[in-house]
UniProtKB/Swiss-Prot annotation:
Belongs to the BPI/LBP/Plunc superfamily. Plunc family. It comes from Mus musculus (Mouse). One of its GO terms (cellular component) is extracellular space. It is found in: Secreted. This is BPI fold-containing family B member 1. Keywords: Disulfide bond, Glycoprotein, Immunity, Innate immunity, Secreted, Signal. PANTHER family: BPI FOLD-CONTAINING FAMILY B MEMBER 1. One of its GO terms (biological process) is innate immune response in mucosa. Glycans are attached at N153, N160, N263, N400. Residues 1-21 form the signal peptide. InterPro entries: Bactericidal_perm-incr_a/b_dom (IPR017943), Bpifb1 (IPR021193), Lipid-bd_serum_glycop_C (IPR001124), Lipid-bd_serum_glycop_N (IPR017942). The gene is Bpifb1. GO terms for molecular function: lipid binding. SUPFAM superfamilies: Bactericidal permeability-increasing protein, BPI (SSF55394).
Length: 474
């Protein structure tokens, strides 16, 4: 638990950026329309949606549509007498469009279709071809259930006559053109229904698979050293044209035992408003700190100062000589320091920058055989914290030590103002504690989410109360 000194320091670091705090989940995966379009398009390809379009039963659809109207049925049979076969010869799904709905928690997905149909008639030796363009529209909604958690669902899939365009690709004889025109007139009321009946179930399956893929890549365990980090779905949401997956998290030790839960929304300074990035993963500050605590646990360092940093050892001896010359003369070749990390580094995330605060206890021993120190100091220090990406890993590095407060806890040489040691202590922490902690952070945190979403490079940025992962600009 952080002591009163570190709380004071953290309050100071937070004070400069204090804004009205809101309630946010531990993490948020924000998927923009570009990602939704790309992955739904791929899911439609995986389900052979274009092959489904090429199998549309055009002739039967015209017959079924006219069957209930005797006069129209007679006309259809007259037209069909001149058709040997008729089918969709090519089909393409054009670029999907994802837009916000006029209703809350709802997206509109428009799927434009471009098809060419051909018919064979004894009236001419060549195939009569005409182009059919239409659009399928569906809604993505957040569905809430009394018996289970909320989930995303695709519904109201349909195709409307108003989006249908048919045109003859090649003008032929008057008789053939008239036949083709009659066929197209019959297709206008029939085509939207067969597209709905045959393609909409495929779109539903493709959406369900896409949603499962999003959940799978989000909840895949992330290896830490030691242990692991796992995300889980709290709830989905829709904001503007974006899908938001509000995430819970848990940290596990090397034995896969849960050491920390983050399964509730909490007051935070973080901002999660969708931006123009194709996607973003926003991680709340307290979860960032829990990850850092896992990577950099509390520990004790023992340092033979003259062997490790002799220049600093001489400087410390000179400082002690100013306090007590007799004590300084007792410092031997095995002069020893012990550093106890009273707290793990606590990260404070501000807009565009981050700092870490940490409390340590430092003890100075004249030799490595002494059991009682010359003196013990409580030190409150802060560092610059730099987050960056390296090979799809979240990396963190500390540098530029700043000592905020020093307290003399025990002294066997005499009472003195510990501020006289500030420069030397800063160098000691710079040369010993920081390299040790940076070494533990060197493995980083693997984050393959960006690559799984189709972006080779990503970058981490710091905002108020949160870390954010977004694709790197090309």
């Amino acid at each position: 638990m952080a002591g009163p000194w570190i709380i004071t320091l953290l309050c100071g670091l937070l004070g400069a950026t204090l804004v009205q705090a809101n309630v946010y989940p531990p993490a948020v995966l924000n998927l923009g329309p570009e990602v939704i379009q790309k992955h739904l398009t791929q899911a439609l390809k995986d389900h052979d949606a274009t092959a489904i379009l090429q199998e549309l039963p055009l002739l039967r659809a015209m017959q079924d549509k006219s069957g209930s109207i005797p006069i129209l049925d007679s006309f259809v049979h007259t037209v069909l007498r001149y058709i040997i076969w008729m089918k969709v010869t090519s089909a393409n799904i054009l670029q999907l469009d994802v837009q916000p709905s006029t209703y809350d928690q709802e997206l509109v997905v428009r799927i434009p279709l471009d098809m060419v149909a051909g018919l064979n008639t004894p009236l001419i030796k060549t195939i009569v071809e005409f182009q059919m363009s239409t659009e399928v529209q569906a809604l993505i909604r957040v569905e809430r259930s009394k018996s289970g958690p909320a989930h995303l669902n695709l519904s109201d899939c349909s195709s409307n006559e108003s989006t249908l365009r048919l045109s003859l690709l090649h003008k032929l004889s008057f008789v053939v053109n008239s036949l083709a025109k009659n066929v197209m007139n019959l297709l206008v009321p029939a085509l939207p229904q067969i597209v709905k009946n045959h393609l909409c179930p495929v779109i539903q399956q493709a959406f369900d698979d896409m949603y499962e893929d999003f959940l799978r890549l989000t909840t895949a365990p992330i290896a830490l050293s030691p242990g692991a980090l796992e995300f889980g779905l709290l709830s989905p949401a829709i904001q503007d044209s974006n899908i938001l997956l509000n995430l819970k998290a848990k940290l596990l030790d090397s034995q896969a035992r849960v050491t920390n839960w983050f399964n509730n929304s909490a007051t935070s300074l973080m901002e999660t408003t969708p931006d123009r990035a194709p996607f973003s993963l926003t991680v709340r500050q307290d979860l960032v700190n829990a990850i850092v605590t896992t990577l950099v646990p509390k520990e004790e360092l023992v340092i033979l100062l003259r062997f490790v940093i002799p220049d600093v050892a001489r400087q410390l001896q000179m400082d002690i000589k100013e306090i007590n010359a007799e004590a300084a003369n007792k410092l031997g070749p095995t002069q020893m320091l012990k550093i106890f990390t009273h707290s793990t580094p606590h990260i404070v995330l501000n807009e565009g920058s981050a700092r870490a605060a940490q409390s340590v206890v430092l003890e100075v021993f004249p030799t490595n055989t002494d059991v009682r120190p010359f003196f013990s100091l409580g030190i409150e220090a802060s560092y610059e914290a730099q987050f960056f990406t390296e090979d799809n890993r979240l990396m963190l590095n500390f540098n530029n030590v700043s000592i905020e407060r020093i307290k003399l806890m025990i002294s066997d040489i005499k009472l003195f103002d510990p501020e006289v040691l500030k420069d030397t202590l800063t160098k000691i922490l710079e040369y010993t504690l920081l390299p040790n902690e940076n070494g533990k952070l060197r493995t980083g945190v693997p984050m393959s989410m960006s690559k799984a979403l189709g972006y080779e490079k990503a970058m981490w940025s710091v905002s108020k109360g949160a870390l954010k992962l977004t694709p790197a600009s090309s």
